[in-house]
């Protein structure tokens, strides 16, 4: 299954012989879910921002469950519309999306070796980013930067990191950044402001705020031998 969000375009480019793709498509306007419970939570279905090559691969049993939802929605549309129709369409649509969330979780687990390989590549790229002056050249590391580096969409990459590490991608990046920052802070020949610029922060106060929020003390306090600081 491939999911397409608003304003996204997908096209099929056949190779060699003419190939006509076939299957089912479910397309709905945002007005359908506006003001509903599904509308409030639609952003949680992050697979709408996945790239087409990050499609959901269904087992036969999973496919049957999805087709039941498709058929239920289709039957509600083709029969005479009554006051129950919209509610039943929405409940089946939400059920379909919840199934897809479950099946993507299964896919992440069954492809654990692939996921672990991506984590290892991410670690390598992140360490290189921190250690090879990219902080000053490019600025603070972002989720989209590493997703692009690994040829993944940001949402798919973020969901994969969350499944593998228990942390969001940005939390994981901040964790590694602050570990590197702790090393820098212990170099007392440089001021905290200098270090913050070296770490890619435009403003020293932003670094101080993040450090204190995550570590529990300000950078100057962490540097001081008089304070028993967390590690």
Segments the model singles out, each with a brief description of its role:
Residues 112-150, 171-190:
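A short, Lys/Arg-enriched amphipathic alpha-helix from helix-turn-helix/homeodomain DNA-binding modules
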Residues 145-148, 152, 157, 161, ...:
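Append "Primarily bacterial transcriptional regulators
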Residues 163-202, 224-231:
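Terminal helix-turn-helix DNA-binding modules in bacterial transcription factors
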Residues 208-231:
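…primarily DNA-binding HTH/wHTH and HhH modules…
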